[in-house]
Amino acid sequence: MSVLESVDTSNRHQGVGIVGAGLVGCLAALAFAAKGYSVTLFELRPDPKTVDASERNLRSINLAVSNRGIRALKYVDDAMADRILEHIIPMKGRMIHDTTGTKQESQLYGLFGESINSIDRGFLNDCLLAEMRHSDDINVLFNHKLVQLDHLMREDETPTMTFVDTRDNKAEPKTFEFDYIVGADGAHSQFRYQMQRSMRMDFQQKYIDMQYLELYIPPNTLEGATSKFSIDPNHLHIWPRHNFMLIALANKDGSFTSTFFSPWSVIESIKSAQEWVVFFKKNFPDAYKLMGDDHLISVYESNPRGTLMQVTAYPYHNPTGRAIIIGDAAHSMVPFYGQGMNCGFEDVRVLMELIDTNHGNVTKSFKQYSDARKKDLDAICKLALDNYHEMSSKVTSPLYLIRKKLDYTLGKYANGTLFQWLPLYTMISFRDDIPYAKAIAIEKRQATILNRVQIVSLTALALYGAVKAAQCWDRFRR
């Protein structure tokens, strides 16, 4: 038996219930509230203010905020975006660390000095939660576990969501009624599962043969140090080692959040903390010096190994246009293009712009959203998966570097003068006006041109070499 609670919206527009108080759910709540809706946000976890920070950050890959995410923040609240962006650290490119620990190579991201931006996931989530606490139109209920969705199939019915309070095993479930409901509860979405029980939804879940382990580079406290950062804070640091790699992103306090990615077979072949230290010292000698034995041993013994999973689903809305999934609940991707959060925030912006276009008709907007978004979400999920190979292996390949240099040169000096040319990374990270699918289509055409240029160039070099060799041989015979 459950207790029905209908949210009072008598002095407001219609009521919206959102499941998931992560990054995307919080931004969605702020976006709906800004449009005049009464919002209730449900979260399974306890209030972050009551949880020790060290427990929250054990499995939190730092975020790279780029133009798509920033545009979505500014769409919802320009002043809020400015407050958040005060705490970012710009990263102008990748810094590639070699196997000796003595050489580093910068590979710039932007054509004209553009940067992506490092920010701590927990900090950003706290910022969004703090913004919601200033709103009279958003009610946040922590420790609420979704157990059932109902009334999703008939036009004349209003959706309901049933929750249990995880703090009280004896409490009766409570059922809440809303005009519209949104699932933003992550890759393991209970909201999505409940939708699937009552409607036809394509769904695929794929675990990637990859684990991640979080590490930490402390601030530089050496006497006489000129910076609190041990390595350049304005780069995303990568230690590429073909089938495994280490990355590090700067934090405002001078520390770096570092993450080790590898196939499960690699980490499982290491049988002890001491073996882990030896492995780390051999493969990442400069990072080893910054972390030290004690930290590496603690990480091996205490930090959980995270799994990487890709989730796709379609459609994202229910038949009546009253329920929808966004963010990782609809499209969980691997973190290798830095677009997971940016894409989720863009989901919110695209949905809100549809509501604007449809003059506040949320039902029509929910129904249009699936077709409007699918090809872009499919495109970025695939691109994120493909980019692991680039980050872990190709960034050190001479042919790759030549190709990237040519791509960069054409984008910087030829684009807009001789012909249109934009590198893929520029389109994905810095051109929020170009949808993901369109960016990849443009890149495909440009890649064909680059392939032909490379073939012609290599053929010309080979012919030149053959002619020179023939001339040398002719002189030798004389």
UniProtKB/Swiss-Prot annotation:
Names of the cofactor(s): FAD
EC top class, as a word: oxidoreductase
Task of the protein: Catalyzes the hydroxylation of L-kynurenine (L-Kyn) to form 3-hydroxy-L-kynurenine (L-3OHKyn). Required for synthesis of quinolinic acid.
InterPro entries named in the record: FAD-bd, FAD/NAD-bd_sf, Kynurenine_monooxygenase
Family the UniProt entry places it in: Belongs to the aromatic-ring hydroxylase family. KMO subfamily.
Protein name, as recorded: Kynurenine 3-monooxygenase
Matches recorded under Pfam families: FAD_binding_3 (PF01494)
Gene Ontology molecular-function annotations: FAD binding; kynurenine 3-monooxygenase activity; NAD(P)H oxidase H2O2-forming activity
Intracellular or extracellular location(s): Mitochondrion outer membrane
